Amino acid sequence: MQSWSETAVPSVPGQGPPLRLFDTADRQVRPVTPGRTATMYVCGITPYDATHLGHAATYLTFDLVNRIWRDAGHDVHYVQNVTDVDDPLFERANRDGEDWVVLGMRETALFREDMEALRVLPPRDYIGAVESIGEVIEMVEKFVASGAAYVVDDPEFPDVYFRADATEQFGYESGYDRATMDTFFAERGGDPDRPGKQNPLDALVWRAARPGEPSWPSPFGPGRPGWHIECSAIALNRIGSGFDVQGGGSDLIFPHHEYSAAHAESATGDRRFARHYVHTGMIGLDGEKMSKSRGNLVFVSKLRGEGVDPAAIRLGLLSGHYRQDRPWTEQVLADAHTRLQLWKDAAALESAQSATDTIARLRQHLADDLDTPKALDALDGWARRALDNGGSDTNAPTEFAAAVDALLGVRLRRP
């Protein structure tokens, strides 16, 4: 699948401290220590609707990780999937009387436009679930052969399920107790009451063909992949086991990331799918989580269509810490516009005080678990001092603009 176009990233003299991120599995902030090539997998969209601000906040978070690694001199192998074969896509297509393939292609194209407008650096591998079906089938065959998965006793719909106890370490990624797992499994796409399952938490890895649904041939009969195994297969076949960061929203901690890890670990025998599990908070509107079911989504494309500067959207979402649930309000957007203009005015000066210390603070705050509130405050301080007091360093405004562009993805000057 085609990704979106990459924007140029300026180089900035110097280097920041090593990146530290909160790891969901270990419940602590700890160093991320990639090799020469840093590796990251971030779960992508199910393309049945436009990109809302909750999506955007997640992809902006991991764009910062990408930029910090690049700033440190790493090559970055970033993989993102598109869940272009799944129940929500079929349900929306049926509701609207539209072909599910056409719907998925249109919304994926709109997502790419939104990411490009927000200046999110594209993944090296952008993979649709449909493209990975052969890889999923190979994994499911391995599970069935090893006893990690079984076919339910249902002649009409012989689905294949992965045993939740197939790995000893199941549950380490989320740290949830059984009651919490049961609740989230039922609420987030699981089917605990499916007749024939041996454990309510066993996860679907191959769904036998149903009338009106697409299907592909397999040794277990025609069908299509389950949700979690798609990400396991895509990641393992691009960046292998033990990659540096797996990312997504906090609503993916369980079941999605728990099962993606368990599937991969069962297939490889490794103890840990990713070295770091990193999750973003939810974006809310009027005190509620932004979600399709509540009908309170704010879409990036709609804001762009209203003439909102994508850089202001980006700054508004970066104004809060990525791990916190936080609101989106008109005031957040207004403050972002004000901040953007402040920085642009400072970057347009012919000279100012040195920006070296401020750039060092920017790097330091971002390396400290992506502390964007402190990073943005440091940049505000330099910009105000530059505008109020001037300075004799003719390189400072250019260096300031380059650092903001490279590390935060916000362009202050026309190319």
Swiss-Prot record:
Q: Which residues bind L-cysteinyl-5'-AMP?
A: 43-46, 58, 81-83, 227, 249-251, 283
Q: Which PANTHER family match?
A: CYSTEINE--TRNA LIGASE, CYTOPLASMIC (PTHR10890:SF3), CYSTEINYL-TRNA SYNTHETASE (PTHR10890)
Which Gene Ontology CC terms are recorded?
Answer: cytosol
**Intervals of motif 'KMSKS' region:** 289-293
Asked if the record carries the keyword Lipid metabolism, the reply is no
Name the positions where Zn(2+) binds: 43, 231, 256
Q: Name one GO biological process term.
A: cysteinyl-tRNA aminoacylation
Q: Which domain of life is it from?
A: Bacteria
Co-factor binding details: Binds 1 zinc ion per subunit.
Q: Which reaction does it catalyse?
A: 1D-myo-inositol 2-amino-2-deoxy-alpha-D-glucopyranoside + L-cysteine + ATP = 1D-myo-inositol 2-(L-cysteinylamino)-2-deoxy-alpha-D-glucopyranoside + AMP + diphosphate + H(+)
Names of the cofactor(s): Zn(2+)
Cited Pfam families: tRNA-synt_1e (PF01406)
Q: What is this protein called?
A: L-cysteine:1D-myo-inositol 2-amino-2-deoxy-alpha-D-glucopyranoside ligase
- HAMAP family assigned: MshC
What does the record note on quaternary structure?
A: Monomer.
What InterPro entries does this protein's entry cite?
Answer: Cys-tRNA/MSH_ligase, Mycothiol_ligase_MshC, Rossmann-like_a/b/a_fold, tRNA-synt_1_cat_dom
- Annotated region (Disordered) at 1-20
Q: Which UniProt keywords apply?
A: ATP-binding, Ligase, Metal-binding, Nucleotide-binding, Zinc
Kindly list the GO molecular function terms attached to this UniProt entry.
Answer: ATP binding; cysteine-glucosaminylinositol ligase activity; cysteine-tRNA ligase activity; zinc ion binding
Q: Where is this motif: 'HIGH' region?
A: 45-55
Function according to Swiss-Prot or TrEMBL: Catalyzes the ATP-dependent condensation of GlcN-Ins and L-cysteine to form L-Cys-GlcN-Ins.
Q: Do the record's keywords include Ligase?
A: yes
Q: What is its EC number?
A: 6.3.1.13
Q: Identify which top EC class this enzyme belongs to.
A: ligase
Name of the coding gene: mshC
- Where the record places motif 'ERGGDP' region is 187-192
